[in-house]
């Protein structure tokens, strides 16, 4: 129990005023004091839910389904006191993502009756839980622009995208307010998981409310209004967007959605979410939003609204200052050479939805759907880095292997547990078998990296920033 949790009187008064009468304040406070259940989402870009369930059963992990996400589970592990969830082999290989159950709901809402997404925007995407969930829902097809304003969070976003084998994402690093003017009516689907006061995160962080005040709620509401307007301008006619927060007050939730109607009138339709999952009606508002208090589903507090754009809007006028784009499409000759080398050395091919782009000695695989947007905005990175050229051919990159390779590849070298631990510590390994050339390294049937045979050892190709120590699986 979080008996020392800080709940300001003004916050409790606000909850008392706005919480539906059928919910109890005593149950709300009791729920806030209970530690949050650990939850994960299976990464179906790497393994199916059934395959993961089999792995979990072998490790005696108990999985309880999350009702609103087919790939989400609350998890209980016998070794939780000795091995952190993030240090399990399955997590490090990208087979699952540690994600709070409530935060899976916005992407579920965005994907409902919306299977054929060609161009999506995740406007505030770090650390990447919803970006990777959306990419998986898109089956790595189309294009997904993942934006993050905070410089310190871009690196972890990039790392999570690579670990999960996502290949259809372009990263941007802007204040989300620029999208409405820079890319008007561009995206058929938009997720705005807005920065907020975080009232719903109390169970995860007992100190979450120490900096809370009614004034801070009003202040952040101004930012949210700007962001939702920008997102609506960037949304195509007929497109859908989801607005979500991990907070509980009406100022940052219902009022922000109603502001959109005040600005754009009949162009805005709220799509009801009462049938999103069984028992969703327990959190349903009169507008059709989901307002999740922590005691309803024993989860974090959350808010989710789904909005459709019925008519065009006039975006703000902007002047773009873009430098020269440093990449060029690979020529047919270059592309054929890259494809042939990738096939002959590693028995791999890039997906049909990607194409080669060149920057100096670097070879990248961009989502084809990004091509019309390349001259419209500045990007932190697009797609994944496939290789670096050198005089003897190509030096394939770790992130490309994580995006492309599967454990049934004929070049794979399967490690035992001790060797896999050595691998993640950045050390070369000496299996009791031999090989030659570059090899895809696997552990328990999951791809974990790229190595190269040097004599009777495999030279470790793990990027330095991924090297781990401590108690691993």
From Swiss-Prot:
Does the record's keyword annotation contain RNA-binding?
A: yes
Task: Provide the residue positions that the database annotates as binding S-adenosyl-L-methionine.
Answer: 124-130, 148, 175, 193
Q: What is its EC number?
A: 2.1.1.178
Its predominant location is cytoplasm
In the record, what terms sit under GO molecular function? Answer: RNA binding; rRNA (cytosine-C5-)-methyltransferase activity
First-tier enzyme category under EC: transferase
Q: Where's it found, cell-wise?
A: Cytoplasm
Q: What Gene3D superfamilies does the record tag this protein with?
A: 3.10.450.720, Vaccinia Virus protein VP39
Q: Which GO terms describe its biological process?
A: rRNA base methylation
Q: Which InterPro entries match?
A: Methyltr_RsmF_N, MeTrfase_RsmB-F_NOP2_cat, MeTrfase_RsmB-F_NOP2_dom, Nol1_Nop2_Fmu_2, Nop2p, RCMT, rRNA_ssu_MeTfrase_F, SAM-dependent_MTases_sf
Q: Give the GO cellular component terms, alphabetically.
A: cytoplasm
Tree of life domain: Bacteria
User: Signal peptide span per the entry?
Assistant: none
Q: What does this protein do?
A: Specifically methylates the cytosine at position 1407 (m5C1407) of 16S rRNA.
Query: What family does this chain come from, according to its entry?
Result: Belongs to the class I-like SAM-binding methyltransferase superfamily. RsmB/NOP family.
According to UniProt, the name of this protein is Ribosomal RNA small subunit methyltransferase F
Tell me which species this is from: Aliivibrio fischeri (strain ATCC 700601 / ES114) (Vibrio fischeri)
């Amino acid at each position: 129990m979080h008996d020392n949790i800080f709940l300001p009187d003004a916050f409790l008064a606000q909850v008392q005023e706005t919480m539906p009468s059928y919910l109890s304040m005593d149950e709300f406070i009791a729920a806030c004091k209970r530690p949050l259940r650990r939850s994960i989402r299976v990464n179906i870009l790497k393994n199916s839910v059934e395959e993961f369930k089999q792995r979990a059963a072998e490790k005696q992990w108990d999985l309880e389904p999350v009702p609103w996400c087919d790939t989400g589970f609350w998890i209980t592990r016998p070794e939780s006191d000795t091995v952190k969830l993030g240090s399990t082999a399955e997590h490090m290989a990208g087979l699952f993502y540690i994600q709070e159950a409530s935060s899976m709901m916005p992407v579920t809402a965005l994907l409902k009756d919306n299977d054929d997404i060609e161009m999506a925007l995740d406007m505030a995407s770090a650390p990447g839980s919803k970006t990777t969930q959306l990419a998986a829902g898109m089956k790595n097809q189309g294009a997904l622009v993942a934006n993050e304003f905070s410089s310190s969070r871009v690196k972890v976003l990039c790392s999570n995208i690579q670990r999960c084998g996502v290949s259809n994402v372009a990263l941007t690093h802007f204040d989300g307010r620029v999208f409405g003017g820079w890319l008007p009516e561009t995206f058929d689907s938009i997720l705005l998981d807005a920065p907020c006061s975080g009232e719903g995160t109390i169970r995860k962080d007992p100190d979450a409310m120490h900096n809370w005040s009614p004034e801070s709620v009003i202040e952040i509401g101004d930012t949210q209004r700007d962001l939702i307007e920008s997102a609506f301008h960037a949304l195509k006619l007929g497109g859908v967007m989801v607005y979500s927060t991990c907070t509980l007050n009406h100022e940052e939730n219902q009022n922000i959605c109603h502001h959109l109607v005040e600005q754009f009138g009949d162009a805005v339709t709220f799509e009801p979410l009462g049938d999103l999952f069984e028992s969703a009606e327990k959190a349903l508002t009169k507008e059709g939003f989901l307002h999740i208090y922590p005691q309803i589903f024993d989860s974090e507090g959350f808010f989710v609204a789904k909005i459709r754009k019925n008519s065009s809007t006039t975006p703000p006028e902007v002047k773009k200052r873009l430098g020269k784009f440093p990449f060029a499409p690979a020529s047919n000759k270059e592309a054929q050479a890259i494809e042939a080398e990738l096939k002959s050395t590693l028995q791999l091919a890039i997906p049909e939805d990607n194409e080669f782009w060149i920057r100096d000695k670097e070879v990248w695989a961009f989502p084809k759907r990004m091509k019309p947007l390349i001259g419209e905005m500045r990007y932190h990175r697009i797609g994944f880095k496939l290789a670096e050229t050198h005089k003897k051919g190509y030096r394939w990159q770790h992130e490309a292997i994580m995006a492309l390779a599967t454990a049934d590849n004929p070049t794979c070298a399967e490690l035992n547990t001790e060797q896999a631990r050595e691998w993640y510590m950045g050390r070369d390994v000496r299996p009791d078998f031999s090989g030659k050339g570059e090899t895809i390294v696997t552990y328990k049937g999951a791809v974990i990296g790229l190595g190269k045979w040097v004599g009777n050892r495999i030279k470790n190709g793990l990027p330095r920033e991924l090297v781990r120590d401590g108690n691993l699986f």
